[in-house]
Amino acid sequence: MMSEPIRIKPPLTDRDVEKLKIGDRVLISGIIYTGRDAAHRRLFDLLKEGKDLPFDLKGQIIYYVGPTPAKPGQAFGSAGPTTSYRMDAYSPSLIERGLKGMIGKGMRSDAVKEAMKKYKAVYFAATGGAGALLAKRVKKAEIVAYEDLGPEAIRRLEIDDLPVIVVNDVRGNDLYIEGEKKYRKE
């Protein structure tokens, strides 16, 4: 029997993310941000230059998604996750400055996992191939930075019960590695 999903609402605190463990089913509601590799590169460059970011990272969640155009009556087009390793070069710097969660698909680098452990952040997986269903969880979307990047612009999303699973927790655990162990032949 599966337990009820855990409900969270950003901004998240250290205490919020410390409660989460790999395999937890989570429903996220409230405000999150979108960003992919081109936007991450720009955020990283701003940090290197000592400049302010276009939004406050503290306690926030970034969803690695590039939406398709929204259909009439929808706030957002398809909202399927992007492969996360493309953000790995930039993520440790963002985590160090207060980012508490990332949503994507696929494994993360050791450097990202170490940053999550050190600065208390988590990585969630959203279901790949379910972009149309995930889009229904987006109630409002607005571009807040880098409009010139088109689908890769940073958007502020208002979401309601976006379903995700904890893949990496603050203790350094990795659901992909632990899951594989169950089925490995010794």
Task: Show where each model-derived region lies.
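Feature captures the catalytic cores and cofactor-binding loops of soluble hydro-lyases/lyases
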Residues: 34-35, 39-162
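Short, glycine-/Ser/Thr-/acidic-enriched flexible segments
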Residues: 13, 33, 68-70, 171-173
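Active-site/ligand-binding-proximal alpha/beta "capping" segment
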Residues: 91, 166-186
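Short, structured beta-strand/loop micro-motifs enriched in basic residues and often containing a Trp
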Residues: 3-12
